[in-house]
C-alpha cells in the first residue's frame, strides 16, 4: 500500500474516531431531557448526570495526554470504543439511577479516550485545521440526523444512549488503520522534548474551558427552553436542532475551505462575540422564531470557532500534547456546563442565565484572541532557518506570496542545520574561508 493510501486511511479513521468521541456532547440536550423525563429526575439532577458523563470524558483526555503514545493509538482507540459500547449500552438497558450514572461515567471515559486519540492524531497531520474541520463536519452531520430520528423512536432515556453505543460499534473496524503500539513508541522516542509554548497553551486551555462551559450551560438546557419557555413540541425542537446542526455543517465547510487564509485571531475573536449575542437571544426566546434564529446562528458559528481553536492548539506542539490538553480542558468545560446551566436557570431564570454566560464569553474572547495573534506565525520563507537552538524555525517574517501548504507552520519541528567539515586536499593549499563566496569557490590553489 502506498504512503498516500495509508495517510488517507489514517485520516478516515481519525475523523470517524473524532465523530464517535464528540457525539455525546452534541447529543447532550436530548440526553439530559430524556433522563429528566424518563427517570423522573429534576432538571438539576439530570444536568448533574450529564455533567458526570462529560467529566469522565475530560478525565480520560487528561490521563492520556502524556501516555497515549506509549499505549499506542490503535490500542487506546479500541479501549475507548469498548468502554463506550459497554457503558452507554448498560446505561440504556437499565432504569435504576445509580446504574445509569455508572454506565454514563464508563461511557464518558470511553468518549474522552476516543477524542484524545483523534486529537493527537489530527495534530500530527500536515494540515490539522482542515482535519479538525472534517471531524466537526462529520459529527455535526451525524448528530443532525439523530435529532431528526430520535423523536420517532419512542420515549425514555435509552434511545440517545443506544445511538452513541452503536456509533462506537460502527467505528471499531476502521481503527485497524491507526498505527499500532510499536510505531507509536518509535515515534515517541524520536520526538522528545519539553512542552512548548507553556504560557500560551495554559491561557488557551483556561480560556477554552470557560468558553465551552458557557456554551454548554445553554446547550444543556436548550431543549427545556424550547419546550417550556417557547412552548414548542419535542418534534419541533428536534427539527430546530437538526437545522441548526445543518447550518453548522455549512459553517465548518466554509472554515475548512478557507483554512488559515483569514488567520486565527479574527475568526476566534469575532466568532466568540457573535456567539455571545446568540446566547442572549436563545436564552430569552419566547416563540419559534426567536428560538430558531438564536439556535441556528449559534450552531453555525460555534463549530467554526471551535475548529480554529483546535487547529491553534494543534499548532502549538506537533506531538499533539497541547491538542489533547486543550481538548480535555474543553471537555471539562462541557462537563460543567449542564449543571451550571441548570443551577443558573433555576436561580435567575433563563434570560438571567443568558446574561451571565454572555458576559463570560466576552471576557474570555480577549485572551484567546491574544494567544492566536501571539503564536500564529507567518509562513516560513527561504533563507530564514535558524542555525541552532531557540524556537521553531517557523516563527519568521513571511511574505504574502508564500504558499502555506508547502512550508512549515508554527509548531513544526525545527529543521537542524549541521555543519560540514571539508578535509584538506593533499598537495594543495588548505581551504580558507576567504576562498568562498556566495556562488562557490573564488580561487584555486
Q: Where are the regions that the model predicts?
A:
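Short amphipathic helix-loop junctions that connect adjacent transmembrane helices
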Residues: 29-45, 220-236, 282, 311
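Helix-to-loop junctions at the C-terminal end of transmembrane segments
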Residues: 59-75, 123, 250-264, 345
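Helix-loop-helix hairpin linking two adjacent transmembrane segments in secondary transporters
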Residues: 97, 125-180
Amino acid at each position: 500500500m502506498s504512503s498516500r493510501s495509508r495517510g488517507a486511511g489514517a485520516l478516515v479513521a481519525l475523523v470517524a474516531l473524532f465523530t464517535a468521541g464528540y457525539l455525546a456532547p452534541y447529543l447532550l440536550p436530548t440526553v439530559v431531557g430524556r433522563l429528566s423525563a424518563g427517570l423522573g429526575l429534576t432538571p438539576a439532577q439530570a444536568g448533574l448526570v450529564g455533567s458526570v458523563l462529560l467529566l469522565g470524558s475530560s478525565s480520560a483526555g487528561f490521563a492520556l495526554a502524556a501516555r497515549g503514545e506509549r499505549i499506542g493509538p490503535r490500542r487506546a482507540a479500541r479501549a475507548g470504543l469498548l468502554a463506550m459500547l459497554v457503558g452507554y449500552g448498560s446505561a440504556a438497558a437499565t432504569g435504576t439511577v445509580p446504574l445509569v450514572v455508572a454506565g454514563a461515567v464508563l461511557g464518558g471515559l470511553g468518549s474522552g479516550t476516543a477524542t484524545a486519540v483523534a486529537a493527537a492524531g489530527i495534530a500530527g497531520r500536515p494540515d490539522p485545521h482542515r482535519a479538525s474541520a472534517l471531524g466537526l463536519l462529520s459529527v455535526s452531520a451525524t448528530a443532525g440526523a439523530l435529532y431528526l430520528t430520535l423523536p420517532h423512536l419512542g420515549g425514555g432515556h435509552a434511545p440517545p444512549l443506544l445511538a452513541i453505543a452503536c456509533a462506537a460499534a460502527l467505528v471499531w473496524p476502521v481503527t485497524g488503520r491507526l498505527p499500532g503500539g510499536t510505531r507509536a513508541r518509535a515515534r515517541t522516542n524520536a520526538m522528545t522534548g519539553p512542552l512548548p509554548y507553556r504560557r500560551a497553551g495554559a491561557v488557551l486551555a483556561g480560556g477554552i474551558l470557560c468558553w465551552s462551559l458557557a456554551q454548554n450551560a445553554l446547550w444543556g438546557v436548550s431543549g427545556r427552553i424550547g419546550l417550556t419557555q417557547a412552548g414548542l413540541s419535542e418534534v419541533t425542537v428536534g427539527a430546530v436542532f437538526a437545522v441548526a446542526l445543518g447550518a453548522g455543517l455549512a459553517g465548518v465547510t466554509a472554515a475548512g475551505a478557507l483554512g488559515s487564509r483569514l488567520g486565527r485571531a479574527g475568526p476566534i475573536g469575532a466568532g466568540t462575540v457573535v456567539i455571545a449575542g446568540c446566547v442572549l437571544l436563545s436564552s430569552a426566546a419566547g416563540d419559534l422564531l426567536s428560538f430558531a434564529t438564536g439556535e441556528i446562528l449559534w450552531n453555525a458559528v460555534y463549530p467554526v470557532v471551535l475548529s480554529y481553536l483546535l487547529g491553534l492548539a494543534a499548532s502549538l506542539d506537533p506531538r499533539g500534547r497541547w491538542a489533547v490538553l486543550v481538548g480535555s480542558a474543553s471537555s471539562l468545560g462541557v462537563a460543567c456546563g449542564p449543571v451550571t446551566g441548570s443551577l443558573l436557570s433555576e436561580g435567575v431564570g433563563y434570560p438571567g442565565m443568558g446574561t451571565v454566560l454572555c458576559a463570560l464569553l466576552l471576557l474570555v474572547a480577549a485572551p484567546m484572541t491574544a494567544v492566536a495573534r501571539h503564536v500564529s506565525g507567518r509562513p516560513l520563507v527561504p533563507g530564514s532557518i535558524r542555525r541552532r537552538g531557540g524556537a521553531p524555525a517557523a516563527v519568521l517574517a513571511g511574505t504574502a506570496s508564500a504558499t502555506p501548504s508547502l512550508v512549515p507552520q508554527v509548531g513544526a519541528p525545527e529543521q537542524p542545520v549541521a555543519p560540514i567539515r571539508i578535509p584538506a586536499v593533499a598537495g594543495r593549499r588548505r581551504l580558507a574561508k576567504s576562498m568562498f563566496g556566495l556562488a562557490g569557490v573564488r580561487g584555486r590553489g
